[in-house]
Curated annotation (Swiss-Prot):
One of its GO terms (molecular function) is identical protein binding. O-glycosylated. The gene is NUP58. It is found in: Nucleus, Nuclear pore complex; Nucleus membrane. Residues 225-246 have a biased composition (Basic and acidic residues). In rat, the p62 complex contains two different isoforms of NUP58. Isoform p45 has however not been isolated in human so far. Residues 213-247, 579-599 are annotated as: Disordered. It is a peripheral membrane protein. Sequence repeats lie at residues 7-8, 30-31, 44-45, 63-64, 68-69, 488-489, 492-493, 513-514, 519-520, 529-530, 531-532, 545-546, 568-569, 578-579. GO terms for cellular component: nuclear envelope; nuclear membrane; nuclear pore. It comes from the Eukaryota. This is Nucleoporin p58/p45. Keywords: Coiled coil, Glycoprotein, Membrane, mRNA transport, Nuclear pore complex, Nucleus, Phosphoprotein, Protein transport, Repeat, Translocation, Transport. It comes from Homo sapiens.
Length: 599
């Protein structure tokens, strides 16, 4: 019986305890041998062992006597080989102990084990182990192993498929050895934070489930009827056609939202049509008045600018004259005959006086004429008016003649400029033609008409829908007609109530959504919005999700029949994805049948 603090006391062949003897380790022991009696106290190395057959003949204590000794290792050992077939319980913290065929390892163990007769330190074996506790072992098994606690498994080995249920906190999952493939087919279900290959798993196992592929509207393709084919023996009547199935609630919600949006837009249009244009006209008048005031202010600012410039020039001239007078005063009288600056000053001053006198004379004459007219009290006669109009006409003729001469000069300069560009720059392009074309384009653009009812040209929605329905009845059928709601096998025409083709979603005169650019406008020769617009035999293009003769917006194989599964416009003659469909097959009218026996 060992008491106190012992380090690696032997159990087999020692003097104190015989092989398989009865011994109890008390207090604190490190690396004691396994016995049939329970151990008391705190020990590292006999954590859960049951029995030890005496098959070896030498004790190992502590850290062992060598790395390559031929002794069984109990306790904390590094190295050690086996001389025969042993059934040993690996206890404690072991590195490189012999491998066991059926053992229960408990406690904290780092068991890099190999089979007997070939064990080397830090080997990577394949064992059938049921590990519990805190273990960092290499337990790649070919049989199902239930590991609990904290395990770091699969650090080597060359076996393949395993079926492991890992619970607790485990580092690593079922992985083939370094010599095997990294992507073996395992059946391990993990949950929480986990990876199957050398990862970290937190939590318990969960059943593996595959996410279904969902299409438009949240429909699972795996449960769809398009997987059924005639080759598997299923009957055609087992699968439902798309027109007989209810639409997904997501698409129904989208259609309801679209109808609600159209209704709101119609209400806004009605409110705009009921508004009066007096407020807009008043705003226009205010803008005109403000423009006049702005022009007056601009003219005043321009006049003041000119006056300021004139005053600057006059001030500079007066400073110059003052300097001339100062120098003239300082010049002696005998030398002033050579100084001509005063003479120039007086000459310019006389010219200014002359101009001012002429202006005064003209103003005096105008004033005398006005006073004479007021004294005579004579009114303007028709002859005077005709004479004034003739003078104004002659003035306009003279101005037109001057404008014509200027225009001819500009044309000559234009030809010279174009010739210069062609000769020196080698550019024969008429640069004035592009400007002329742009000006013409701006002139030809229609102006925005303002008024109380901008949507007055909109036709009645019910009448348009009825006309569209009658037109479609007269045309040869291009596919199955919708039975309820909106069918994606046929275009978006007359499928909902009064129809979405020519009314509501953008008729040819609807200004709110743009001219000829609605969701299904019936304009001839114009391809508008659509997920695969279809060509009807009448020549009108309507937008839809593809009719039964085109493959505009499909989610499945175009080669299958159009009545099987969830197909969006699927048919045999497949056309481009989001483009306009090709020319449809023109079906002839059916021959006149035998009317015998019919009423």
């Amino acid at each position: 019986m060992s008491t106190g603090f012992s380090f690696g006391s032997g159990t087999l062949g020692s003097t104190t305890v015989a092989a398989g003897g009865t011994s109890t380790g008390g207090v604190f022991s490190f690396g004691t041998g396994a016995s049939s009696n329970p151990s008391v106290g705190l020990n590292f190395g006999n954590l859960g062992s049951t029995s030890t057959p005496a098959t070896t003949s030498a004790p190992s204590s502590g850290f062992g006597t060598g790395l390559f000794g031929s002794k069984p290792a109990t306790g904390f050992t590094l190295g050690g080989t086996n001389t025969g077939i042993a059934t040993t319980i690996t206890t404690g913290l072991t590195l490189g102990t012999p491998a066991t065929t059926s053992a229960a390892t408990t406690g904290f163990s780092l068991g890099f084990n190999k089979p007997a007769a070939s064990a080397t330190p830090f080997a990577l074996p394949i064992t059938s182990t049921s590990a519990s506790g805190l273990t960092l072992s290499s337990a790649l098994t070919s049989t199902p192993a239930a590991s609990t606690g904290f395990t770091l498994n699969n650090l080597g080995g060359t076996t393949a498929t395993t079926t492991t249920a890992s619970t607790g906190l485990s580092l690593g999952g079922a992985l083939a050895g370094l010599g095997g493939s990294l992507f073996q087919s395992t059946n391990t279900g993990t949950s929480g934070l986990g990876q199957n290959a050398l990862g970290l798993t937190l939590g318990t196992t969960a059943a593996t489930s595959t996410a279904g592929n969902e299409g438009l509207g949240g429909i699972d393709f795996s449960s769809s009827s398009d997987k059924k084919s005639d080759k598997t023996g299923t009957r055609p009547e087992d699968s439902k056609a798309l027109k007989d199935e209810n639409l997904p609630p997501v698409i129904c919600q989208d259609v309801e939202n679209l109808q609600k949006f159209v209704k709101e837009q119609k209400q806004v249009q009605e409110e705009i049509s009921r508004m009066s244009s007096k407020a807009m006209l008043k705003v226009q008048e205010d803008i005109k008045a403000l423009k006049q005031l702005l022009s007056l202010a601009a003219n005043g600012i321009q006049r003041n600018t000119l006056n300021i410039d004139k005053l600057k020039i006059e001030t500079a001239q007066e400073l110059k004259n003052a300097e001339i007078a100062l120098r003239t005063q300082k010049t002696p009288p005998g030398l002033q005959h050579e100084y001509a600056a005063p003479a120039d000053y007086f000459r310019i001053l006389v010219q200014q006086f002359e101009v001012q006198l002429q202006q005064y004379r003209q103003q005096i004459e105008e004033l005398e004429n006005h006073l004479a007219t007021q004294a005579n009290n004579s009114h303007i006669t028709p002859q005077d008016l005709s004479m004034a109009m003739q003078k104004i006409y002659q003035t306009f003729v003279a101005l037109a003649a001057q404008l014509q001469s200027i225009h001819e000069n500009v044309k000559v300069l234009k030809e010279q400029y174009l010739g210069y560009r062609k000769m020196f720059l080698g550019d024969a392009v008429d640069v004035f033609e592009t400007r002329r074309a742009e000006a013409k384009k701006w002139q030809n653009t229609p102006r925005v008409t303002t008024g109380p009812t901008p949507f007055s040209t909109m036709p009645n929605a019910a009448a348009v829908a009825m006309a569209a329905t009658l037109t479609q009845q007269q045309q040869p059928a291009t596919g199955p007609q919708p039975s309820l709601g909106v069918s994606f096998g046929t275009p978006f025409g007359s499928g909902i109530g009064t129809g979405l083709q020519s009314s509501g979603l953008g008729s040819s005169n609807l200004g709110g959504f743009g001219t000829s650019s609605g969701f299904g406008c019936s304009t001839t020769g114009a391809s508008t919005f659509g997920f695969g617009t279809t060509n009807k035999p009448s020549g009108s293009l309507s937008a839809g999700f593809g009719s039964s003769s085109t493959s505009g917006f499909n989610f499945s194989n175009p080669g299958i029949t159009a009545s099987a599964g969830l197909t969006f416009g699927v048919s045999n003659p497949a056309s481009a994805g989001f483009g306009t469909g090709g020319q449809l097959l023109q079906l002839k009218k059916p021959p006149a049948g035998n009317k015998r026996g019919k009423r």
